């Protein structure tokens, strides 16, 4: 069984036991989070939401909070001696999907 959930402005396909990296959530490591924005549930029977599946939830355990690798952002305007170099590390949350209730 799998589901498509909406979190952090993105739609993510998840299965039970899977480890996923999502946009940062306000939860500590070891806590359990529940997603109620379930857009689709697949498996033996298919349920499509309009826009979400009524009564469907996905439960996950927070493994850790972290920051992704650094990317370099560079702005440059030719002939004007204008440039700006900046680094950015996006925060993320690592989850393990425990249960899909449909």
From Swiss-Prot:
Record flagged with keyword Plastid: no
PROSITE patterns documented for this protein: RIBOSOMAL_L21
GO MF entry, a single one: structural constituent of ribosome
Keywords: Ribonucleoprotein, Ribosomal protein, RNA-binding, rRNA-binding
GO CC annotations on file: cytoplasm; ribonucleoprotein complex; ribosome
One Pfam family matching this protein: Ribosomal_L21p
GO BP annotations, alphabetical order: translation
Function text: This protein binds to 23S rRNA in the presence of protein L20.
Similarity annotation: Belongs to the bacterial ribosomal protein bL21 family.
Subunit structure: Part of the 50S ribosomal subunit. Contacts protein L20.
Protein name: Large ribosomal subunit protein bL21
């Amino acid at each position: 069984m799998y589901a498509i959930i909406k979190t952090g402005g993105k739609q993510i396909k998840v299965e039970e036991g899977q480890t996923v990296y999502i946009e940062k959530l306000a939860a500590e490591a070891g806590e359990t989070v529940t997603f109620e924005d379930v857009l689709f549930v697949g498996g033996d029977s298919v349920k499509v939401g309009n826009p979400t599946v009524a009564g469907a939830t996905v439960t996950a355990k927070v493994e850790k909070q972290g920051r992704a690798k650094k990317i370099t952002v560079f702005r440059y305007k030719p002939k004007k001696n204008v440039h700006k170099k900046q680094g950015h590390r996006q925060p993320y949350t690592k989850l393990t999907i425990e249960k899909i209730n449909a």
